[in-house]
Structures are given as structure tokens and as C-alpha cells.
Curated annotation (Swiss-Prot):
Transmembrane segments: none annotated. The variability of the residues taking part of IgE-binding epitopes might be responsible of the difference in cross-reactivity among olive pollen cultivars, and between distantly related pollen species, leading to a variable range of allergy reactions among atopic patients. Pfam families: Profilin. A motif (Involved in PIP2 interaction) lies at residues 84-100. InterPro entries: PFN, PFN_euk, PFN_sf, Profilin_CS. The lineage of its organism: Eukaryota, Viridiplantae, Streptophyta, Embryophyta, Tracheophyta. Disulfide bonds join C13-C118. This is Profilin-1. GO terms for molecular function: actin monomer binding. The modification Phosphothreonine is found at T114.
Length: 134
């Protein structure tokens, strides 16, 4: 299966039990900032934005004072799991980023999708990739 198929079939799919509800954008990005696959709607990000995200995984709390920036959009960093997940909120939407051994799994949502639904979609793929040694 191609990386694009993982994004299309596992991240941009309908939310279980909520037909028609899906993430706004999603991507799988290498730790070096290289895009492995992304939805057509995933924002073009700057290298320094990805560097900030990777720094926060290695030094939890790094993004809290300034917020998480992705594609020029600023998200307020909310609770996460140090070194494992970063969550951000902006208005009625937000972002979840999970880290595997080699990649970041990113999901962006807007209402009616809830933060919990976004977390579930992103974490399900992240768990699978971890099981595969990725």
C-alpha cells in the first residue's frame, strides 16, 4: 500500500458512525520534514514550523508559549502526551500530531468533527505504523 493510500483510506475516511464527517486535512511527514503523503487540503508548511514541532516532541512544552504554527496557521497547544502527541486548537477546529519511530501522523479538523474523533483517527493509524516498526 502506498503512503498516499494510508492518507486517503485511513485518515481522510468517514469518521466511524458519522457518515460524511471526516478530517479537513491530513498528512504523513518524515521526522526530517519530508512529506510522505498528504491530502490535497493539507497546508504547505515551512521547514521552521516542522522543526518547532519536532523540538516539542523532544522537549515537551517548547511550543506552549508561542503556539503551534503549521502552514501559517497558529494553534493554541493543549494537553498532549509528552514525546508522543501534540494537540492544538484554533476556533472550532484543531490539529492532532502523533509521532512514530520515523514519521509524524497529522490530522486537522473543523466542526462537526470533534477533537476526540480526530484523535481516534490519527491514533489508529499511528498505532498501526508502530506495530509495523515504522
Amino acid at each position: 500500500m502506498s503512503w498516499q493510500a494510508y492518507v486517503d483510506d485511513h485518515l481522510m475516511c468517514d469518521i466511524e458512525g458519522h457518515e460524511g464527517h471526516r478530517l479537513t486535512a491530513a498528512a504523513i511527514v518524515g521526522h526530517d520534514g519530508s512529506v510522505w503523503a498528504q491530502s490535497a487540503t493539507f497546508p504547505q508548511f515551512k521547514p521552521e514550523e516542522m522543526n518547532g514541532i519536532m523540538t516539542d516532541f523532544n522537549e515537551p512544552g517548547h511550543l506552549a508559549p508561542t503556539g503551534l504554527h503549521l502552514g501559517g496557521t497558529k494553534y493554541m497547544v493543549i494537553q498532549g502526551e509528552a514525546g508522543a502527541v501534540i494537540r492544538g486548537k484554533k476556533g472550532s477546529g484543531g490539529i492532532t500530531i502523533k509521532k512514530t519511530g520515523q514519521a509524524l501522523v497529522c490530522g486537522i479538523y473543523e466542526e462537526p468533527v470533534t477533537p476526540g474523533q480526530c484523535n481516534m483517527v490519527v491514533e489508529r493509524l499511528e498505532d498501526y505504523l508502530l506495530e509495523q516498526g515504522l
